[in-house]
Amino acid sequence: MTENQTTPDPGEPGSSADRPGGLVPTGDSAEFVAGRSRKGMFGVRGTGDTSGYGGLRLPAYVPAPAERPYGGWFDEVADGLFLALRERGVPAESVLQVTVDRGEITFYVDRDHLLEICRSLRDDPALRFEMCASVSGVDYGPEVPQRLHSVYHLLSMTYRRRIRLEVALDVDDPHVPSVVEVYPTADYQERETYDMFGIVYDGHPALTRILMPDDWDGHPQRKDYPLGGIPVEYKGAEIPPPDQRRAYS
């Protein structure tokens, strides 16, 4: 990447946006270890690239824990959050890590204190994150500890700011408190994340599937969910389902 270039070339560190898979406290200097690299489209295995482009398989990019100063208004929000948590008697260790990457700040938080953190972000006059714009899930695959993440995008209409909260979960214990009592807009989004990823939002008023039938087996956006499909004939050639295609490596 050249000195004036802002977008990394394919294959360079920083060109992939894989997320972290494990959590460390904010005071620890250790970095996340993703344990895998990103693959391209069409079921590529190995490099799978004969063009010389080099962008079908990229090294895993893992943003390091951020250190003060975070820059801009990020420090103001972080200071306000920790002060509000102290006033509520919530330990500072409930914020496991802070990451600043691509101009966005993410707070990785302990699920046991998620509701208190959300209330502090919503109600504190210096913060005023009044709206939860979206709730989504991520599955980082079986190679990653705490592979399931519940992600919350919060918006302050008062100060015109956006932040992100993430809670990392074990696939064998995918429970996290529902934030519907704090942010009612999270209702249907938590249902969708439960439906697609199997993350269980404890305390949700009606946690049922919202996209798939009620008797559907499994959660379609998990990495270990079978792709399935039916063979498709096209101009005399048959294209098998993705998980039955031949590997050429």
Swiss-Prot record:
It comes from Saccharopolyspora erythraea (strain ATCC 11635 / DSM 40517 / JCM 4748 / NBRC 13426 / NCIMB 8594 / NRRL 2338). SUPFAM superfamilies: Nqo5-like (SSF143243). Residues 1-29 are annotated as: Disordered. The keyword Membrane applies. Gene3D superfamilies: NADH:ubiquinone oxidoreductase, 30kDa subunit (3.30.460.80). Its EC number is 7.1.1.-. NDH-1 shuttles electrons from NADH, via FMN and iron-sulfur (Fe-S) centers, to quinones in the respiratory chain. The immediate electron acceptor for the enzyme in this species is believed to be a menaquinone. Couples the redox reaction to proton translocation (for every two electrons transferred, four hydrogen ions are translocated across the cytoplasmic membrane), and thus conserves the redox energy in a proton gradient. This is NADH-quinone oxidoreductase subunit C. It catalyses: a quinone + NADH + 5 H(+)(in) = a quinol + NAD(+) + 4 H(+)(out). Its main location: membrane. NDH-1 is composed of 14 different subunits. Subunits NuoB, C, D, E, F, and G constitute the peripheral sector of the complex. It is found in: Cell membrane. The keyword Cell membrane applies. Belongs to the complex I 30 kDa subunit family. GO terms for molecular function: NADH dehydrogenase (ubiquinone) activity; NADH:ubiquinone reductase (non-electrogenic) activity; quinone binding. It is a peripheral membrane protein. Keywords: Cell membrane, Membrane, NAD, Quinone, Translocase, Transport. GO terms for cellular component: plasma membrane.
